[in-house]
Amino acid sequence: MKTTLDYVDAVKIKHDLPSDYALAKLLGVSKQAVSNYRLGKGGFDDLTAVRVAELLDLNPMEVIAVANRERAKSEDARRVWTGLFDRFAANFEGLLGMMGQRPALRAA
C-alpha cells in the first residue's frame, strides 16, 4: 500500500518542485507539515489528501484511504482503511481493465 511519503514525492516530481517549501505552498500546508510527512510523524488531513489526489490526477478516495490508515489509532481501524483501499484499487483496476488500461495502484 502506498504511503504519504510516496504521494509527497510524486507531487514534487510531477510538478517539478525545487524544494519542500515549494511543495508546502502548493499543498497549502506549512513547511513543518511537509517535514512531518517525510519523517513519518504525521499524515495528510482529508482536505490535503484531496488536494494531493487532484495534483496527481487520482481518485481522492485512494489518497484519503491511505491518509486515514496512517492516522488510525488501532489495528482494527488500520485494517478497515487498508480493506477500503484494496477494494477501491481492485474495482478501479477492473474498470480500467475493461477499458484496456492497467495502472499500478497496488504497492507493497
How would you name each of these model-derived features?
Residues 27-44, 66-69:
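Recognition helix of helix-turn-helix/homeodomain-like DNA-binding domains
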Residues 20-24, 52:
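Short alpha-helical "recognition helix" segments of helix-turn-helix
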Residues 1-18, 61-64, 102-108:
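A short, Lys/Arg-rich alpha-helix, primarily the initiator
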Residues 17-19, 44-47:
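Residue-level signal for the short linker/turn that defines the boundary of a DNA-recognition helix
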Residues 65-108:
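Short, charged recognition helix plus adjacent turn
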Residues 6, 23-28:
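Long, hydrophobic N-terminal alpha-helical segment
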Residues 46-62:
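DNA major-groove recognition helix of helix-turn-helix/homeodomain DNA-binding modules
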